[in-house]
Curated annotation (Swiss-Prot):
Protein name per UniProt: Alanine--tRNA ligase
Catalytic reactions of this protein: tRNA(Ala) + L-alanine + ATP = L-alanyl-tRNA(Ala) + AMP + diphosphate
Matches recorded under Gene3D superfamilies: 2.40.30.130, 3.10.310.40, 3.30.54.20, 6.10.250.550, Bira Bifunctional Protein, Domain 2 (3.30.930.10), Threonyl-trna Synthetase, Chain A, domain 2 (3.30.980.10)
GO MF annotations in UniProt: alanine-tRNA ligase activity; aminoacyl-tRNA deacylase activity; ATP binding; tRNA binding; zinc ion binding
The record's note on its domains: Consists of three domains; the N-terminal catalytic domain, the editing domain and the C-terminal C-Ala domain. The editing domain removes incorrectly charged amino acids, while the C-Ala domain, along with tRNA(Ala), serves as a bridge to cooperatively bring together the editing and aminoacylation centers thus stimulating deacylation of misacylated tRNAs.
E.C. numbers: 6.1.1.7
Length: 873
């Protein structure tokens, strides 16, 4: 009845709904409330604050089918995926939770009732474990549920310390903790393995299917356990494991979801062996990759994006092993959506974006893979021993972008090891070099330790009466300074905005009678705000009163550019997709720069749509609203938070109509209409998966448009027409140029044919083979290929080596007729000559090209050709 995975999921949630639980949707794979966590890896993650007593919800019982990823960081199953029956990068965790409501008795009863009642699993196939001192749980299992005592196994502290046990759960060194009870299923005597707690427990016969954690203590720093006033329950059952049991199979990869994905992958790639482990890897990895992209993660070189990139590339590499010659991975997404059923709502909504992102990464990696595998194969061919050295692994990673885990995978398949210590040492050395290169002589942010807090009044004021609370000169605290001194001035309150969130610091002046300090930049130093600049007039000392005056014009222009980045961010998400997230920005008075995640170049029509959408919002003249609220409330309202930014519990939310809502501490215009005009000046890629837009606003945008118009009019004049006819006239000119190029190429071919007739007569014979070695004058490098083709046809059977040498450049081409390539290879010949003139090259056995940088050595190099050929002909 509940044999399909989809039916099992529904049955679990419905059972707990009937037991008074609130069915809660799976949270994102990107944790929203835990910066310490790379990915959501357990059902309890989204309820962490509930368990800690920091959040109260409208329900005290919950049930979920939570999407989880374990790859990277502490919980990393990547290396085992595909090679074992139960390791995955992606899995679904069925869970029921109690926040101070029911406890051990009900939690145990619910689990047993669902397994033996709803799913009708044979009771004799089940055994349970409890923590060795948890007599309460033992008695519930034995006396209330009726599990025989011999099927209840007490597990002690088996990890070398008090409470360090498979059956004692701890959130950390301190905090909530408690014993747990686990339910195991016996797959039968035909599979090796023993009951939990036995020497053979690592076998596959007895498989844990449900873990029930009883959070009943609060662990203190001294190790003592204090009872919690409201104990809680956290449970988890992997849907893949229970599906395997219900479907009568042993390996998770044999269940319906995986079988559909494996069959589809085999069909796309064109393989018949459905037991191949590479198909398992691909089937697992498409689940984690597709859902990660759907939840907003894009392939990149850092953080979550890098883990995603590694998983995609591992899948592609296994496809390559199976013989895939074209992109295949993204084509599994429709099958995944169908197989996951109701659990794929978010994936279905973002299907197009997911497919595009996976395809783009696959195409990019195809180039890296071919080159990297060639390098790795060469290194392994020369390997002495059974361990690939760390330097080679690092070179593959650093120079060729070949992931370390793929190198380890290839070595593993060949029963070889990887020198991880050597790789880590090479990586550490590179980091230290980078850190040394990034050190500056005067790092004020590191040097100034300012304890004083500065009040910022610059949201509403551009001038303020302030008092000097600290002065710094050359990184040292001073009490006073005279004219000419370069200083950092710290005030008790200031209207100057300190650089933050991409917005540059304000400029302006600090003034008093006979005193003028020109502020060139404003920076944060802890809780203090430092005004960096030069004392132009008079003297100042700690305790002086000054008037702080922000440069209004510069601030206003900066505000135009900052406000429009919010509109740009929202527009990009509307036009390109909700996967777009801000990756960095620079906002100054002259321009704005906005970096964002996207897996391919932005098309011209998409860029125009973004620009038009932003300008539409400017014309709508939305009033900007600013509000302070709790961060969770802000996120609930849909406010965009920037990944990597740290926010206080209270945040400032900036809203522009119903178009944009973001967390932001920067300064802004009053209405979007103040921006006037938005104009994109450039768009391009700055890193894999990261794009950059540069733009201008207001008067700068008007000036940019005027400049473009002037250049267009100048182009029209050069083409002897008006602006309206520029495109047509330019097309005509390009067509004419292409025709002339075609005619020029034909003429060169004729000249080459004529020249070849003359040159063929200069061929000499070596052991009956015609050989032509010639240094040419007055011939362009582009004509060499056609000329050697003509000469080979004229000679019918022979070897040709042509060279051009002038200035500091040498061009070489070698040609060998097909009947002689068994004796002489053009690539070897041209490489031999190139090596003598400071160059290198290669190519096919019948034709190869090379370059060099030492024309003075060319004649000597050409003289070596005949002796070289004598040895081979």
């Amino acid at each position: 009845m509940y044999q399909t995975t989809a039916a099992l999921r529904s049955a679990f949630l419905e059972y707990f709904r009937q037991q008074g639980h609130q069915v809660v949707d799976s949270s994102s794979l990107v944790p929203g409330n835990d910066p310490t966590l790379l990915f959501t890896n357990a059902g309890m993650n989204q309820f962490k604050d509930c368990f800690l007593g920091m959040e109260k919800r409208s329900y005290v019982r919950a049930a979920t089918a939570q999407r989880c990823v374990r790859a990277g960081g502490k919980h990393n199953d990547l290396d085992n995926v595909g090679y074992t029956a139960r390791h995955h990068t992606f899995f679904e965790m069925l869970g029921n939770f109690s926040f101070g409501d029911y406890f051990k008795e009900d939690a145990i009863r619910f689990a047993w009732e669902f397994l033996t009642g709803t799913l009708k699993l044979p009771k004799e196939k089940l055994c349970v474990t409890v923590y060795h001192t948890d007599d309460e749980a033992f008695d519930i299992w034995n006396k209330q549920i009726g599990v025989p005592a011999e099927n209840i196994i007490r597990i002690g502290d088996n990890k070398g310390a008090p409470f360090a046990s498979d059956n004692f759960w701890q959130m950390g060194d301190t905090g909530p903790c408690g014993p747990c009870t686990e339910i195991f299923y016996d797959h039968g005597e035909h599979i090796w393995g023993g009951r939990p707690g036995s020497p053979e427990e690592d076998g596959d016969r007895f498989i844990e299917i449900w873990n029930i954690v009883f959070m009943q203590y609060n662990r203190q720093s001294d190790g003592t356990l204090d009872p919690l006033p409201k104990p809680a329950v956290d449970t988890g059952m992997g849907i893949e494991r229970i599906s395997a049991i219900m479907q009568g199979v042993h390996s998770n990869y044999e269940i319906d979801i995986f079988q559909k994905l494996i069959a589809k992958a085999a069909e796309i790639i064109g393989v018949s062996d459905l037991e191949n482990k590479s198909l398992r890897v691909i089937a697992d990895h498409i689940r984690s990759c597709a859902f990660l992209v759907a939840d907003g993660v894009m392939p990149s070189n850092e953080g979550r994006g890098y883990v995603l990139r590694r998983i995609i590339r591992r899948a592609v590499r296994h496809g390559n092993k199976l013989g895939a010659t074209d992109t295949f991975f993204y084509k599994l997404v429709p099958t995944l959506i169908e197989a996951m059923g109701d659990a794929a709502k978010e994936l279905k909504a973002t299907q197009t974006i997911v497919e595009k992102a996976l395809k783009a990464e696959e195409e990019q990696f195809a180039r890296t893979l071919e080159r990297g595998l060639g390098m790795l194969d060469a290194a392994l061919a020369d390997l002495k021993g059974d361990t690939l050295d760390g330097e080679t692994v690092f070179k593959l990673y650093d120079t060729y972008g070949f992931p370390v885990d793929l190198t380890a995978d290839v070595c593993r398949e060949r029963n070889l090891k990887v020198d991880e210590e050597g790789f880590n040492a090479a990586m550490a050395e590179q980091r230290s070099r980078a850190q040394a290169a990034g050190q500056f002589s005067a790092d004020y942010n590191a040097a100034l330790k300012i304890d004083t807090a500065t009040d910022f009044c610059g949201y509403t004021e551009l001038a303020a009466e302030s008092k000097v609370v600290a002065l710094y000169r050359d990184g040292e605290s001073v009490d006073a300074a005279e004219a000419g001194a370069v200083l950092v001035v710290v005030l008790d309150n200031t209207p100057f905005y300190a650089e933050s969130g991409g917005q540059v610091g304000d400029k302006g002046q600090l003034l008093a009678e006979g005193v003028e300090f020109n502020v060139a930049d404003t920076q944060k130093f802890g809780q203090g705000i430092g005004h960096k600049g030069q004392l132009a007039l008079g003297s100042i000392k700690v305790g002086d009163s000054l008037k702080a005056m922000v440069d209004k014009k510069l601030r206003h222009r900066t505000e135009l550019n900052h406000s429009v980045t919010h509109l740009l961010h929202a527009a990009l998400r509307q036009v390109l997709g909700t996967h777009v997230t801000q990756k960095g920005s620079l906002v100054d008075p002259e321009r704005l720069r906005f970096d964002f995640s996207h897996f391919e170049g932005v098309k011209r029509e998409e860029l125009k749509a973004v620009e038009d959408l932003v300008n539409t919002q400017i014309r709508r003249n939305h009033e900007l609203n600013f509000a302070e609220m709790d961060i969770e409330e802000a996120k609930a309202k849909g406010a965009m938070a920037l990944f990597g930014e740290k926010y206080d519990s209270k945040v400032r939310v900036v809203t522009m109509g119903d178009f944009s809502i973001e967390l932001c501490g920067g300064t802004h215009v009053g209405r979007t209409g103040d921006i006037g005009l938005f104009k994109i000046t450039s768009e391009g890629g700055i890193a894999a998966g990261i794009r950059r837009i540069e733009a201008v606003t207001g008067a700068a945008a008007m000036a940019y448009v005027a400049q473009q118009q002037a250049e267009l009019e100048e182009a029209a004049a050069l083409l002897k027409g008006d602006v309206a006819s520029v495109v047509a006239k330019l097309k005509a000119q390009l067509d004419k140029a292409r025709q002339l190029e075609k005619e020029n190429a034909q003429l060169k071919d004729k000249l080459a044919a004529a020249a070849s007739a003359d040159l063929a007569g200069d061929a000499q014979e070596i052991n009956g083979v015609k050989v032509l070695v010639k240094r040419l004058e007055g011939v362009e490098a582009g004509a060499l290929r056609g000329l050697q083709d003509e000469l080979k046809q004229k000679l019918k059977s022979g070897v040709v080596l042509l060279a051009i040498g002038s200035g500091d450049k040498v061009n070489l081409i070698a040609g060998v007729t097909q009947d002689l390539t068994g004796k002489v290879k053009a690539g070897e010949l041209v490489a031999m000559v190139a090596a003598q003139v400071g160059g290198k090259g290669g190519g096919r056995p019948d034709m190869a090209q090379a370059g060099g940088s030492e024309p003075a050595k060319l004649d000597g190099a050409l003289a070596s050709v005949v002796p070289w050929l004598n040895e081979r002909l």
